[in-house]
Amino acid sequence: DSKYIEFIFNKAEYFILKENYIDAIEILLEHKDNTKFLIILINLYFKMGRDHEANLLLNDTRDKLIKDKNFYNYLGIRYLYEGNFEKGWEYYEFRGSKLTNILKGTKLWNGEKIHNKSIVVFNEQGLGDTIQFSKYLLSLRKISNEVSFVVPKKIIHLFNHNLDKIKIETNDTIINKTYDYKITLGSLLKFFYKDKFKINENLLMRDQININKWNKKLDITKPKVGIVWSGSFLGPNEPFRSVPLKSLDKILSLD
């Protein structure tokens, strides 16, 4: 039924996927009283660089969004973009990716004193976020007795396995193990986001052989810039998070 609201919503998303933004916006504007359509419209405006329109719409409807818990995650992300980290991390707790079904008998950590307790931290995000936010386990280590960090098998080799009071695990290696507390990596940030780290303060393993290899290939007298040009093809916000590698030809050919 073309008048069915889910059909109309899917039609708008289809137009966005096909980069037919004019027709998508027309549908979204017509149904912006529906919060689902409203969120997509605001997001689309931001992604198109129409920040003024996006911010006007967001600010006019923020009170409406606050009343609907289904969109707290979106509010959290927007607050984080705006630099309001306290509210941002508070609302981010309502994200859909938050793991709740692992080690069900283990208490969720919510800031209690754990200096003589063990705690396990679960990865829940993409590989990049797992690497980026893993440094906050260094803060957690300072206030706990033992920290275990569960990461995907495909990147376990990237982490230092000889850190004091931090164990790197996978879902397979924690079977039959018990912990006093658990927390997801995304939730850890609300406790430690103000902490500062030096560039070499992280959980990563330095592969000196690989470093030496690339130092020989690259001109060390010039700046070195890394470009992440593609996210997971099945990840959120695709195709907006990726660009064709060919489109970087001119940049990559610069001397």
What are these regions (language model features)?
Residues D1-S2:
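A detector of tandem-repeat and repeat-rich interaction/domain scaffolds
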Residues E6-D255:
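Catalytic machinery of carbohydrate-active enzymes
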